[in-house]
C-alpha cells in the first residue's frame, strides 16, 4: 500500500486527488494539509467524500509527518513546492507536483513567466516532466515529477505524432484552446462568477499565457528543433473540460494521418484516437483520465486539424498525477483510473 500525503487539499485539484485516490486499491491518503482549514475533517468540507476518509482531517504542513509518506502530491499555487520539495526528497519521499514549479527546465524562463525568482533551481535538472506518453521510462526512476498543465497536455498529445514523424511545418503551429471555469481555480474572483462566465465566451492572455513556454518546450523536444507556436486560450461557460483545436501544415501529403495517430497511441491506455471524421466532445471525458483525439485534413489540403479533448481536472491535473504515481511505484498504470466519462 502506497502511503500518500497531499499538500494543499482545499482546491479543485486537491479534492479531485482525494476523489480518485478514494477508489485506488493500492493507495492510502494518510495526511492532507491546509493551513487555513487545519483541524477540519475532510468529509465536513467535501460531503461527496463522506464514508471514504472518516477520521482524516486537514493539518498544518509538517515535514516530519509528510516525510513519513511514500509520496507527497503538491496541489498548491506556484512557489509552494519550491520551499518543501527539497526537504521531502532528502527524507526519501517521492514528490509529484501538480503546480508549475518544476515544469520548465530554465529557471530564468520560469521567473519571467511567474514573476518571481525560482525557489529551487538546484532541483530542475532531476525533475521529470510527467507526460507518460513521452517520459514513461524516466518517470519510473524519478524522485521528483512535474505534472503537466491542462492546456499543455491536450496540446502536446495532439501535435506529438506530427512532429515526431517530421511531417508538419514546426515553424508555424496554432493552438486554439477552450477551457472550463474550474481551470481558474477555486479562489474567489470576479472573472469566475456565474454571472460573468455564463452565456459568454472570451479569449484571454493572447499576448502570452504561462503555459506557452511549457508547450513550446515539449513540442521542441518532439520536433528536435525550435517551434513557432501561436497559442490562444479561451474561457468557456462550462465547469470542466479542455478543447484544443490544433492547426499544422503538412510537408508530406502522402502520409496516412489516421494510421499515424493510431500507431503512435496504440499502446497508450489513456489516449483514444477516434475514427476518421470524428469530433470529440468535452463531455465524453468528464471525470475520466482520457485524452480523446481526432485528426482531419479538410478538403485533402495541406492543413491538418487535430481535435483534442480532456477533463482539465483529471488528465489535465489530478488523474495524470495518479497515473504518474502508478508508474513510479510499479503498479498497473490504469489502477484507480479506469472509470468512464460521465454522461450526460
Curated annotation (Swiss-Prot):
One of its GO terms (molecular function) is N-acetyl-gamma-glutamyl-phosphate reductase activity. Belongs to the NAGSA dehydrogenase family. Type 1 subfamily. Pfam families: Semialdhyde_dh (PF01118), Semialdhyde_dhC_1 (PF22698). It catalyses: N-acetyl-L-glutamate 5-semialdehyde + phosphate + NADP(+) = N-acetyl-L-glutamyl 5-phosphate + NADPH + H(+). GO terms for biological process: L-arginine biosynthetic process. GO terms for cellular component: cytoplasm. It is an enzyme of class 1 (oxidoreductase). Catalyzes the NADPH-dependent reduction of N-acetyl-5-glutamyl phosphate to yield N-acetyl-L-glutamate 5-semialdehyde. The active site is at residue 150. Gene3D superfamilies: Dihydrodipicolinate Reductase, domain 2 (3.30.360.10), NAD(P)-binding Rossmann-like Domain (3.40.50.720). It is found in: Cytoplasm. The keyword Cytoplasm applies. It comes from the Bacteria. Its EC number is 1.2.1.38. This is N-acetyl-gamma-glutamyl-phosphate reductase. Pathway: Amino-acid biosynthesis; L-arginine biosynthesis; N(2)-acetyl-L-ornithine from L-glutamate: step 3/4. PANTHER family: N-ACETYL-GAMMA-GLUTAMYL-PHOSPHATE REDUCTASE, CHLOROPLASTIC-RELATED, N-ACETYL-GAMMA-GLUTAMYL-PHOSPHATE REDUCTASE, CHLOROPLASTIC-RELATED-RELATED. Keywords: Amino-acid biosynthesis, Arginine biosynthesis, Cytoplasm, NADP, Oxidoreductase. NCBIfam families: argC. The keyword NADP applies.
Amino acid at each position: 500500500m502506497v502511503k500518500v500525503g497531499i499538500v494543499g487539499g482545499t482546491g479543485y485539484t486537491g479534492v479531485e486527488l482525494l476523489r480518485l485516490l478514494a477508489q485506488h486499491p493500492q493507495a492510502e491518503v494518510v495526511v492532507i494539509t491546509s493551513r487555513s482549514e487545519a483541524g477540519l475533517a475532510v468529509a465536513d468540507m467535501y460531503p461527496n467524500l463522506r464514508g471514504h476518509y472518516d477520521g482524516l482531517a486537514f493539518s498544518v504542513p509538517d515535514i516530519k509527518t509528510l516525510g513519513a509518506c511514500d509520496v507527497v502530491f503538491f496541489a498548491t499555487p506556484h512557489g509552494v513546492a519550491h520551499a518543501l520539495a527539497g526537504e521531502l526528497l532528502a527524507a526519501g519521499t517521492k514528490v509529484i507536483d501538480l503546480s508549475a514549479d518544476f515544469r520548465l527546465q530554465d529557471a530564468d524562463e520560469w521567473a519571467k513567466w511567474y514573476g518571481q525568482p525560482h525557489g529551487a533551481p538546484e532541483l530542475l535538472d532531476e525533475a521529470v516532466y510527467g507526460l507518460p506518453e513521452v517520459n514513461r521510462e524516466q518517470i519510473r526512476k524519478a524522485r521528483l515529477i512535474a505534472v503537466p498543465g491542462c492546456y499543455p497536455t491536450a496540446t502536446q498529445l495532439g501535435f506529438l505524432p506530427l512532429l515526431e514523424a517530421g511531417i508538419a511545418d514546426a515553424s508555424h503551429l496554432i493552438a486554439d484552446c477552450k477551457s472550463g471555469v474550474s481551470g481558474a481555480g477555486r479562489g474567489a474572483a470576479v472573472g469566475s462568477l456565474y454571472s460573468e462566465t455564463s452565456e459568454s465566451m472570451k479569449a484571454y492572455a493572447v499576448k502570452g499565457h504561462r503555459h506557452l513556454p511549457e508547450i513550446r518546450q515539449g513540442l521542441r523536444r518532439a520536433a528536435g528543433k525550435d517551434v513557432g507556436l501561436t497559442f490562444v486560450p479561451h474561457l468557456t461557460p462550462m465547469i470542466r473540460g479542455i478543447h484544443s483545436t490544433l492547426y499544422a501544415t503538412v510537408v508530406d501529403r502522402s502520409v496516412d494521418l489516421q494510421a499515424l495517430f493510431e500507431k503512435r497511441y496504440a499502446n497508450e491506455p489513456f489516449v483514444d484516437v477516434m475514427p476518421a471524421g470524428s469530433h470529440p466532445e468535452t463531455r465524453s471525458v468528464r471525470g475520466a483520465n482520457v485524452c480523446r483525439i481526432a485528426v482531419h485534413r479538410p478538403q485533402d489540403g495541406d492543413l491538418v486539424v487535430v481535435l483534442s479533448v480532456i477533463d482539465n481536472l483529471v488528465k489535465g491535473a489530478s488523474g495524470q498525477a495518479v497515473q504518474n504515481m502508478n508508474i513510479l511505484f510499479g503498479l498497473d498504470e490504469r489502477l484507480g483510473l479506469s472509470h468512464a466519462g460521465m454522461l450526460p
